[in-house]
């Protein structure tokens, strides 16, 4: 069974044997592991000036970063961030990964048309707009949705639809204390386009993983009712209890994540190891679980801590 097939079984909440699947939204520490700048950190201001040979070499080097990290750490999925982010380069990057690894890995890309928490520069203006111009927000999200689903449909026509398995929707909605969008506003402004894009992707044959950090509990019902195949992060720093979420929603949705990034960053080795084991213990029963951090392997994280997490997964994250 390929790693791709194992990820898909987890998304479908089906029984699997061997290791619980694992992957990370992003593994930024490629310089430390491979001696290469992560693809998302590269700047190609003169891309259009480059020769076809130079472009191909750059794309192959990016593909190597993605696939080598997956091989080294046993990841079953690769979240591909095309750079430059256009259709032509996305297709070529995905093709290189498929050419070099076959159908071994579940490949996904970003594809979320909904609004995230605004940054500090936009916070006040956007907050006012929620109340003063909700129809404008809805219209803008619909325009983004059309653009993203057109991209997905176009991609599905390439290589018999074999390049991409799904989309990961990465708009963040929540702070650690509460959602940015109150539940009623979330239900009116955000949930409808979220449900619509998930259905559109599913109708095309794509899987969906919905990511958001923070305290999702006040909007959990909305998220589940939008029917993504999986929910990612399950942020313990936002008070999300994986065991309780599993008990209540584990028959409806695959759960991904929950290893506390805060403890990986600042906790003791003993605290971090205990939390890693807790996530495995709470998430694995009943299947429908993909093991990962509660965010990603971000710039500044101690690689030794992720290596410890991966070692515990290899030794203990196994279905009997």
Located regions from the model:
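Active-site loop segments of alpha/beta catalytic cores
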Residues: 1-65, 76-320
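Short, solvent-exposed loop/beta-turn-alpha elements that line the ligand-binding surface or hinge
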Residues: 70
């Amino acid at each position: 069974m390929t790693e791709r097939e194992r990820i898909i079984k987890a998304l479908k909440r089906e029984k699997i044997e061997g290791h619980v699947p694992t992957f990370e939204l992003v593994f930024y520490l490629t310089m430390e592991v491979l001696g290469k700048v992560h693809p998302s950190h590269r700047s190609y201001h003169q891309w259009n000036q480059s020769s076809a040979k130079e472009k191909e070499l750059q794309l192959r080097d990016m593909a190597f970063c993605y696939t080598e990290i997956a091989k080294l750490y046993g990841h079953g999925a690769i979240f591909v961030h095309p750079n430059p982010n256009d259709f032509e380069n996305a297709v070529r990057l995905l093709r290189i990964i498929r050419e070099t690894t076959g159908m071994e890995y579940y490949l996904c890309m970003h594809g979320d048309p909904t609004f995230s928490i605004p940054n500090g520069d936009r916070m006040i203006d956007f907050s006012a707009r929620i109340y003063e111009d909700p129809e404008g927000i809805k219209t803008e999200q619909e325009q983004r949705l059309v653009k993203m689903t057109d991209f997905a449909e176009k991609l599905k026509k390439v290589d018999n639809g074999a390049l991409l398995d799904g989309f990961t929707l990465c708009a963040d909605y929540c702070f650690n204390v509460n959602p940015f969008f109150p539940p009623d506003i979330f239900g009116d402004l955000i949930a409808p386009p979220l449900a619509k894009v998930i259905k559109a992707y599913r109708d095309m044959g794509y899987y969906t993983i919905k990511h958001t950090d923070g305290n999702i509990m006040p909007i959990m019902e909305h998220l589940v009712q939008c029917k993504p195949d999986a929910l990612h992060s399950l942020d313990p720093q936002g008070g999300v209890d994986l065991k309780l979420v599993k008990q209540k929603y584990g028959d409806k949705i695959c759960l991904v994540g929950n290893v506390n990034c805060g403890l990986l960053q600042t906790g003791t080795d003993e605290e971090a190891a205990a939390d890693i084991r807790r996530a495995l213990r709470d998430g694995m029963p009943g299947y429908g679980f993909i093991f990962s951090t509660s965010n990603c392997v971000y710039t500044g994280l101690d690689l030794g801590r992720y290596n410890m997490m991966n070692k515990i997964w290899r030794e203990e994250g196994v279905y009997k």
